[in-house]
Amino acid sequence: MYEHLRELREDKGLSQKDIANLLKVHQTTYSDYELGKLNIPISALIKLSVFHGTSIDYLLDQTETFQPYERKTKK
């Protein structure tokens, strides 16, 4: 189960259907993403990370650090 996905959604007061609409999937599909029953496509992970302002690692419970990595600027 991806706890961070659920927590971020609930913190914004959104339903699974709201996020499913953002991703253009059915609510049951999004529910399966949160429960870890389905692999989340990378395109959906990118949308979710931008929407929530965090890293994909955080979304997938691979880190407890909410903020995304800082981008290094090219010199």
Q: Can you say where each PLM-predicted feature lies in the sequence?
A:
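Hydrophobic side chains within well-formed alpha-helices
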Residues: 1, 5, 55-56
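Conserved hydrophobic/aromatic packing and binding residues within compact polymer-binding modules
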Residues: 5, 19-20, 30-33, 59
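Short, charged recognition helix plus adjacent turn
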Residues: 60-75
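Recognition helix of helix-turn-helix/homeodomain-like DNA-binding domains
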Residues: 24-39
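Short basic helix-loop element that most often maps to the first helix and adjoining turn
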Residues: 3-22, 47, 73-74
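Conserved amphipathic alpha-helical interaction elements at protein-protein interfaces in regulatory
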Residues: 7, 11, 51-54, 65
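DNA major-groove recognition helix of helix-turn-helix/homeodomain DNA-binding modules
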Residues: 24, 43-58
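DNA major-groove recognition helix of helix-turn-helix
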Residues: 34, 52, 60-63
